[in-house]
Every structure is written in structure tokens, then in C-alpha cells.
């Protein structure tokens, strides 16, 4: 048995007969071994006696922050991980927290240095940027780490049952609670879950990643969550990267801890919106104020229609005015346009994508791809009749499935979407506040709303836009 700061740490489930291969022993065992070395060195570098009189109780209630009817999100500041290496080169904790504060109930900060390139110095940077509780996420084996975390303004800690035995857990949790800090208790299998229940954990994180071999299995949340008693807050951790996963797993969990899927995206704001709400587009924008309304409601994309027969047609000058309203990712909608016209428009407006709404074939798409800016995607709208059209075009990143040629306000038979792979599909046609919730459950990447959120063609209704996005967040 080892003693670290007076707390037993004999109970790591590593190197024991519970672990069935040398490889799986190694990952967690090595991390814990290195953490013991780190703790010993840090105690010499920054003794508790030097700062213990400056430690104050947390004023941000982690447990309360995770209560309520809505699904909650703990969003994570993570520079690197053992499975992926460096995830975010341009890692600025305060900047990241400045985005997260609009969406998160709590914010997690990786502080492990060796495996996650974290730092305790990140904690006060994040704490100063937000009002939410800040979770110190580390391999905690010693009371000293908890005291250090609180000194650096953490409001909660992670305790991993794969690392701690019951006695060590109880003592470490007591230290955290004595500082008014919350505890996220992590379990990754049925045995650890039963221990969490016995130990009276208030918030249980079900880790979908097996730390012994770093594999991901989202079924772990589906299988383990129903075993937890009423009153326990359930957080699903690891492997969550899509809105459809959030909607489906929200039946089992009260919330999600998400890090890698967000940290790997250059546009963090858009990345959070994709996971929390889907990749949604408000199309047919003609006014800057409507672009702003769409953005603040949670849209990722704004649609600009360059088809002159449309009542929502905009020219380049008008489009610039719309774009000035909000930093959406803008999609230009074209039908049977000259390739050079599409290219020029995409370049002049820095479009994120061009959406082809006519009978543009593979040859047209190939030629267009050659001349478009590399960061401008090609989307193709397809009309859905009695059967699902094929989606086999090369160089097409997204398909928009619509009724007819679009803009009709009519929906097609959504039952045709059953058993379809819809990761690269935006659903359009007749979408509004009354049916967007049902539409969101179909599993598409996002929704494309237009006439259903208007008071007149091209004039968006702020209340209807708000109602759509509020409905998308009810899960």
C-alpha cells in the first residue's frame, strides 16, 4: 500500500487480475505511476504550507449547475490527448471559455501535463472568463491535488473509480466537499457503477472510453445509465460528436461532457452549435437583421439565393449587406448558373458552400470544383418524390433534400428517410416551429428552414426563428 498525502492509493484497478492484457495494463498504470511522480515533485516545488492559508471555499455550486429539466453540457478545454496527440494547436483557455460560457452549465479544464498538455495555470484563466463552475479534470490520487485545484480556482474535481479504491475515494471526496467543491465520479463499467452507487455519488460520469485501451463504445451509456437510482445526475463522457448522438443518448443521460470533438474544430462557436443544435441553415436571407437573428438563435449557416426568379433573390451588393449582419457560414444558392458566375460570387463573398438547385450533373460539378476556392464546399439539392433519389455524386459534401425545387413550403414524405444514412443531409421543405422537433429526430445533419420562419417572402420573423431553435434544444 502506498500513502500519498495520507490518502490510500492502493486501489488502482491496474496491474491486477481485473486487467487481462499487458497492453491494457500499461495505459492507465503508466499514467497513474507518472502522476505519483508528478505529485511528489509538485509538493516540493509548491508545498501546501505555502498556499493553504489562501485557499477559500468555492462559491460556484457544481451540483446545482447540473440540475434542471434541460440536458446539460460540461464543455472541455483540452489541448491534447493520449489517443489523438495535439488536438488544438492554437490553445487559448480564456478564448475557449469565452465561447463555452454561452452554452455550458460547467466548464472542464484538463490539468494533466504529460498526457494532455494541461496545466493548473489554465484554471484561473477559465474561471476569470466565466461565471459557471470550473471542473479540474485530472488523475487525482492525492488530497494535495484537490487543494491545489481549489487554490487555482477550480470548483469541482474528477474522481475516477478506475483509479481509486473505495476508501481513497471517500477521503478525497470529503476533502473536496470540505472546500464546497463538487465531485464528478467517473465509472466505465458495471462494477465501477455499483461502487459509485454504494459510495453515494451525486454526479456520475459514464466514460464511453475504456482507459485501458482507449476504445470508444457509446453503448456503455445506454447499458449503464438505467442502473443508476433516481436523483443521481448522469453525465455521458467521451465519443460525443454529433447532434443525433446527443438527442438519442439524452434519453439515458442528464448531460454530456464534450471535449475532443469541439477542440479539433477551428470555428469553435460553430462546432458547439453543431453538437448542441445540429448543422442548421436559415435560407433566403435578404436582410442583415435577419442574419443576426438567425445567428443569435443558433444557426450555423445562412442561405443567400442567387436565383433571380426567387422572391428571396439577392445580388452581390445586397448579399454583402446581409453578411455584415452576422458571422454565419454563408451558402450561395444557384440554379443552372454559369460556372464562372458561381466562382466569382463564391470568391467575392467568401462563401462556405455553393448549393446547386437545378439539374447540374457530375460534369458540371467536376468543372466547378476545379475553379472554386478549396475551402468552399459544393452542396446539391435533390427533389424527393415518391422515392429517395440516389446520392452518389462525387465532390458533393452535403445534400439538401427538399420537396420539388425548393421554396414551396411543402414537405415530402419523411418516412422515406427511414434506414438511410443521413450524416451528410440537410432536411428542407415545409419546416417551421410546429414540426422542427419531429424533423430533428430523423437523424439528418441539420435542418434548412426558409418560408416556415417568415412573415413575408424574404422577411424573417424573429419569433418564429427563436421558436425553431428553442424546440431543437428541448431534449
Swiss-Prot record:
Any one of the GO BP annotations: L-tryptophan biosynthetic process
Pfam family, one: PRAI
Annotated GO MF terms: indole-3-glycerol-phosphate synthase activity; phosphoribosylanthranilate isomerase activity
Key words of the record: Amino-acid biosynthesis, Aromatic amino acid biosynthesis, Decarboxylase, Isomerase, Lyase, Multifunctional enzyme, Tryptophan biosynthesis
Pathway: Amino-acid biosynthesis; L-tryptophan biosynthesis; L-tryptophan from chorismate: step 3/5; Amino-acid biosynthesis; L-tryptophan biosynthesis; L-tryptophan from chorismate: step 4/5
Annotated EC: 4.1.1.48, 5.3.1.24
PROSITE patterns the record matches: IGPS
Residue numbers spanned by region N-(5'-phosphoribosyl)anthranilate isomerase: 280-475
InterPro entries documented for this protein: Aldolase_TIM, Indole-3-glycerol_P_synth, Indole-3-glycerol_P_synth_dom, Indole-3-GlycerolPSynthase_CS, PRAI_dom, RibuloseP-bd_barrel
Region described as Indole-3-glycerol phosphate synthase: spans on this chain: 1-279
Catalytic activity: N-(5-phospho-beta-D-ribosyl)anthranilate = 1-(2-carboxyphenylamino)-1-deoxy-D-ribulose 5-phosphate; 1-(2-carboxyphenylamino)-1-deoxy-D-ribulose 5-phosphate + H(+) = (1S,2R)-1-C-(indol-3-yl)glycerol 3-phosphate + CO2 + H2O
Superkingdom of origin organism: Bacteria
Lyase as UniProt keyword: yes
Protein family (similarity comment): In the N-terminal section; belongs to the TrpC family. In the C-terminal section; belongs to the TrpF family.
Alphabetized NCBIfam families for the sequence: PRK00278.2-4, PRK09427.1
Subunit structure: Monomer.
Function: Bifunctional enzyme that catalyzes two sequential steps of tryptophan biosynthetic pathway. The first reaction is catalyzed by the isomerase, coded by the TrpF domain; the second reaction is catalyzed by the synthase, coded by the TrpC domain.
HAMAP family, per database record: IGPS_B (MF_00134_B), PRAI (MF_00135)
Protein name, entry field: Tryptophan biosynthesis protein TrpCF
Organism from which the protein derives: Yersinia pestis
